Every structure is written in C-alpha cells, then in structure tokens.
Amino acid sequence: MKVILLEPLENLGDVGQVVDVKPGYARNYLLPRGLAVLATESNLKALEARIRAQAKRLAERKAEAERLKEILENLTLTIPVRAGETKIYGSVTAKDIAEALSRQHGVTIDPKRLALEKPIKELGEYVLTYKPHPEVPIQLKVSVVAQE
C-alpha cells in the first residue's frame, strides 16, 4: 500500500515522501495517528502544490535575507553601556543587540538567530554571525562602548 508521509519517520523516510508499506501497518498505525495519508491522485496533487508553495516561501525568505545582508554588513552597531575601566556593569545579550539595532537603524532581527555563545561583558569590538537563512550568514559588527 502506497502512502505519503506527513511526519519524518526513522525507518521509512521524510515528510512528503511516497513509500510502500504493508496494508496493516498503514491502516493500524500510520493513518490513525496522522503520520501518513493514502497516496491517491488527489493527495499527490495536493502534495505537489504544497511543495511548490514551500519552495516559493523559501525563495522569498532567501531574497529577504540577501536584502538584510546588504544593510547589516555595511554598518557598525554601537551599544553604549555603563562601565568601569574595561568591564561593563551587567552584560550585553543577543536581545539587547536586537533591540539596539531596531532602535538605532530600524532593522528588526530575531535574537535567537544571532550567534552569541555567552553575553558580552567587556568593552570592545565584536563581529557576530546572524543567520536569517541557512544559506545567508551575515557578519554584524558590534561596538560596545562606555556610556558618557
């Protein structure tokens, strides 16, 4: 019996893949749990339409990421913080960087996609990687300076 997988299954395949399984496995396990649907003509057409729509969305996201890359790689974000000699009071997190970028340049980014292993705790220049799309990494220059 041919089915279209709706969820990735370890021993069968990935989402959208058409696989041949035993009828009992399909009727008693895959279909009732919503893990697959029968590979009928209409379901195959719906799958193709969904794949085309997903490809279009991915292309739009990549184009948006390319536009964002042009903006972000040509600027240096300056974040003023209260500080002593070299150490700052508190720390600068990915969320702080995203808020400062929005405030200073009007660009909104997702702080979860900013590669910051640990919060910044010293004054200085930093180059961080922001990944809005897997194929488009962006190098963001951040300068942490003492507040006057």
From Swiss-Prot:
InterPro entries reported in the protein's UniProt record: Ribosomal_bL9, Ribosomal_bL9/RNase_H1_N, Ribosomal_bL9_bac/chp, Ribosomal_bL9_C, Ribosomal_bL9_C_sf, Ribosomal_bL9_N, Ribosomal_bL9_N_sf
Record keyword Ribonucleoprotein present: yes
Keyword Repeat included in the entry's annotation: no
Highest rank taxon of the organism: Bacteria
Gene Ontology biological process terms from the UniProt entry: translation
GO CC annotations, alphabetized: ribonucleoprotein complex; ribosome
Molecular function GO terms recorded: rRNA binding; structural constituent of ribosome
Sorted UniProt keywords: Ribonucleoprotein, Ribosomal protein, RNA-binding, rRNA-binding
Function of the protein: Binds to the 23S rRNA. Extends more that 50 Angstroms beyond the surface of the 70S ribosome.
Family statement: Belongs to the bacterial ribosomal protein bL9 family.
Subunit structure: Part of the 50S ribosomal subunit.
Stored PANTHER family: 50S RIBOSOMAL PROTEIN L9 (PTHR21368)
Entry protein name: Large ribosomal subunit protein bL9
Species this protein is from: Thermus thermophilus (strain ATCC 27634 / DSM 579 / HB8)
